[in-house]
């Protein structure tokens, strides 16, 4: 690859056309939006890079102290070390990634554990209708309807395109919910809280949309 092909010398740079779902292995879960004729939602444009955006910069996380907590309306509250989380059944998901700041990175391959697997293990109670994702960076949170959190293509990921997630991109583990704007895919995940009522997170408190569907351009609450 020449410098012209990758002007930023960026390992995440995509030269040429984005990966397509039909090129994926048979076991890979394909996010439905990658099969659209036009994969770029309204108001978005494709980036070949993977920009880094966050609210306050990466937190300092000692991997030996990292934990994922499953709390709230569950029959069995659970806590996982990183090794314990990675020992669960793994999935790979092929999806697109849409930032509310109007860029989209197409054709990402994630490796991790399905959110459905986690909800099953903690036995989320029937009255749970929402989740609040808690991150390690200064108490940052984001909310999701339970059905979005439990979509087949949603997971907690520790690899992107075959390599471990860097701290800048949310490593060691981040939430990935492909059919929502990317702020809903919380970096540096610390806990998942199952709730009866919706509860606005960090950006939602500032006016961002509670649902965040990119195909309906739900960027802000005023966009209702």
Predicted feature locations:
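Structured, non-membrane catalytic/scaffold regions adjacent to prosthetic-group chemistry
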Residues: 2-224
């Amino acid at each position: 690859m020449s410098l012209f092909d990758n002007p930023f010398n960026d390992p995440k740079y995509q030269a040429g056309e984005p990966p397509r779902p039909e090129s994926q292995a048979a076991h890979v879960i394909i996010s439905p939006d990658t099969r659209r004729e036009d994969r770029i939602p309204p108001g978005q444009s494709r980036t070949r890079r993977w920009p880094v955006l966050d609210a306050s910069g990466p937190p300092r996380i000692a991997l030996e102290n990292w934990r994922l907590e499953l709390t709230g309306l569950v029959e069995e509250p659970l806590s996982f070390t990183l090794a314990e989380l990675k020992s669960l059944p793994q999935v790979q998901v092929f999806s697109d990634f849409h930032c509310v700041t109007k860029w989209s990175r197409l054709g990402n391959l994630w490796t991790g554990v399905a959110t459905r697997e986690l909800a099953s293990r903690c036995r989320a109670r029937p009255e749970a209708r929402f989740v609040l994702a808690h991150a390690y960076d200064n108490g940052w949170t984001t909310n999701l309807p339970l059905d979005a959190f439990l979509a087949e293509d949603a997971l907690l990921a520790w690899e992107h395109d075959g390599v471990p997630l860097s701290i800048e991109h949310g490593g060691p583990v981040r939430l990935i919910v492909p059919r929502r704007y990317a702020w809903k895919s919380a970096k540096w995940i610390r806990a998942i809280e199952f709730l009866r009522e919706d509860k606005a997170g960090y950006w939602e408190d500032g006016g961002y949309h509670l649902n965040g569907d990119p195909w309906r351009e739900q960027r802000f609450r005023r966009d209702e």
